[in-house]
Structure formats: C-alpha cells, structure tokens
Amino acid sequence: MRNIFFSIIIFTVCWGQDSNNWQELPNAPIAPSELKKHDDLFFRNDTTGWLITRSGQIFHTSDGGSSWIEQLHDTTAYMRCVGFMDDLHGIAGNLLADSLRNVLYKTHNAGLTWEVVDTSTITGEIPYGLCGLSAVDSLTIFGCGRHHGPAYFVRSFDGGESWESFNMSDSVGALIDLYFWDQNRGIMIGGTDEHSDDSHMLVLFTENSGDSWETVYVGERAMEWGWKISFPSESIGYISIQKKPYSDATTEYFLKTTDGGLTWFELPFMFADTSEEDVYSSQAIGFITPTRGWMGSYINDRPTLMTEDGGVSWTEASFGQNVNRIRFVNHWLGYASGRTVYKYVDSTAMNINTHSILPNQISLSQNYPNPFNPRTVIPFELLKDSFVKIDIIDIKGRTIQSLSNGMQSSGNHHVIWNGRDNRGKTVSSGTYFCRLITDESSITRKILLVR
C-alpha cells in the first residue's frame, strides 16, 4: 500500500464540484503509453486552441476541443511548448534540436501551415531545445530551455520574424518555464545544475526584457527544479517543483509569491517515503483564482491534486492523468494537457458572466500625473475576480504596449506605463489611450505624454 500523506490534508476528496468542472475530451488525441503525456497546449479563446505532442504533431481545434485536426507531423521533432501572439501568428518549440537545429516552428495563418524558423534569423547561439514560451502581445514572445541543459533564453519583438538567443549556461544549469506580465517584466525557472542529482530549484526575475536577470530564489535541497508557473492575479503566483525519485527529502513542496514574483516562499503539500513509488514529482500547476488551483504529476499514475485555500491543503481531484500543463482562458474556462486533453467549465461563473453583466463591474481612473514624463500610474478597480487586459493604444489604434494580460483578484490595482513601446523604445510625445478589457466590458482613458 502506498504510504502517502498529504501535509495539512483533510481526507475528504472533493469529487462533487470538481468532477462537474473537469471533463476528459473524448475526441482529443491520446498520448501513446510509452510517451505518457502531451506536454503543452494553448487556447486563444474559449473555442480555438492548439495541442502539441512528443511525437512531433501539432493539432488544432476550433470548437472547444470537440474535434481536432492534425496540422503538422514532423517525426524529427519533440514538440515541447506552444504559444500564439494573436489569432494567426504562433510559435512551437522543439525540445530535441541538437542535430537538425529545428528548434523553433512558426505559423502565419493559424496553423494551416507551419515552417521551421531559419537559423539565420536567430542572433546568438542556436539553442539545442526549448521547454517554455510566453507570448505577451502580437509582437512579443519569449522562450527558454532545456530541462537537462544547456540553458538558453530567447526573445522576439517582431512577431517571431527575428530572434535573439542568450546562452545562460555559465550561471544556470537548466531552464524550463517562464512567464512575462508585459514586454519588460517576467520570471524564469529551472535548476542550478544540468545534472538532476546536483540541481537546486531556481527562480530568476527581470525588469528589462531579459537583458539582465536577478536570482530571487534558490532552493535548499538538491534533486529539485522548477517546472511550471501559474499567476491567477498580478501579485499572486505559484510554481511547481519537480523532485527526482529516490532523493533524500521526504517532503515535497511548491512555491508561492504574493508580491508579483519579487519574493517566494515554499509550502509543503506531501510527505512520502523516498522510494520512487511514493514520490509525487509535480509538473503541472494551474490556478483559476488566487485560492483555487490544481497540480499534476506523471509518476506512477499519481492523481491530480486540488486546493481551495491557496495551497494550505490539497485533496485528490477527480480528473487527469500525467497532467503537465494547465491553462485558463478566463475565470470560468480552462484546458489541461496530459495523457489526453481535459476541459474545465465552471457553469455557475459562466452563467453569471452571460446573464448578470453589470455595467459597473470595473472602473478605470484617470492616470496621474497627466500629462506625464517619464512614467505614469494608471489606477483601476475590479468588483470581482476578472481576466484583465490593459493596453496602451496610439491615435491610429495600434497597440503600443501591453501592461496586463491575465487573471486578477477583486479590489484596487494599478499599472505603470513608462512611455515605451513593446520593444522597450521611448515613444514620442502625443495623445495615447489606455484600454482596460475584461470578459464583461471595457473602458478607455486618454493619456497625454509630453517629452
């Protein structure tokens, strides 16, 4: 009998509500038993998404996962990550590009055709593989890899047409996932050593698009590395920690931040023996609110876990096998990839969103100072947890900079615009607009920049 004790756990399994929310999609591709799982998927909205597989396939759905079509099958690739910058332009990353150097794939037509990114468009060393992608807006996307080294960070500011690559192996052993709030601020996770026996959990933070990185967390234990990131709000985020089987530590942890990634603290979720049978070795982590989330594993058919209190306690969820990625489209809909694809629908929240829309669910205050130079504060208020997108628009309707794109909790918030565009370049004096969009409504304010 497996000797597993979840820390601070109440042994009441939440089958009721959770089983109604998560469902396995019957027509989704199933990973072969020898490959165990699909590593990533990405949805632009509630119906349109892409799934990548370890055998080099990219699948597309336009009906919320009811049906799937194969868009690409490249047997030379091990597809590890995928992201879309807009409805047409997407990027997929290959984990094992050692010999063919086919590390990046791109599409300009929503996946009708995919092509290998020409290495001549990559400035710097060509990465050997990628594990994570983070798309910020229609022009900006970041990537990193690999989980077993060497460690590379890549970025594009022109929709994937050209790339910059940075070899970070002198200071980092492995890079696995990353998350950017905007074109400047982001975090990246992995391990201190490319050899798992010597690796410690690592979190890096940047405020200048990855020109430089600050180490904000290093784990105390060896045989651990960061795996996946989830930010349900601007300030609250979570990181799963994968633990190597047979490691000495008998307690497994995850990380949490409450200040937007500047500092992190670990929380235990499981006590176990040191045998492989009893290791959870978490991979996927995904929170739809600051307190409600899930965590997955691929070791020995471990169950997906669920928390309702921000990770203080965990129970077995009623879905998922080998879950590696969990993504949420809005506050009532999400998808997860593992042995197959799973879909989350909170019908209560969806019905409220559809039938009880109130005109005053959000407010966007005038920025201050206004006019401004060089930066300005833009306050806004949410009356409930919402998916929030905040963009700076010029007078021609073009998006200059994206300041927020994700779930945020109810209450008062603010963002800061530094008078720069998505590439970090200073914009000229003139009239600009701040547009706040949620699932229910949008508000726009005029902003004056004076140089």
Walk through the language-model features, giving the residues of each.
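Repeated scaffold domains used in trafficking and secretory/extracellular systems
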Residues: 36-40, 78-83, 127-133, 173-179, ...
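Beta-strand-rich domains and repeat architectures in extracellular enzymes and scaffolds
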Residues: 31-46, 51
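Asp-box/BNR beta-propeller loop motif
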Residues: 17-30, 56-72, 103-121, 154-167, ...
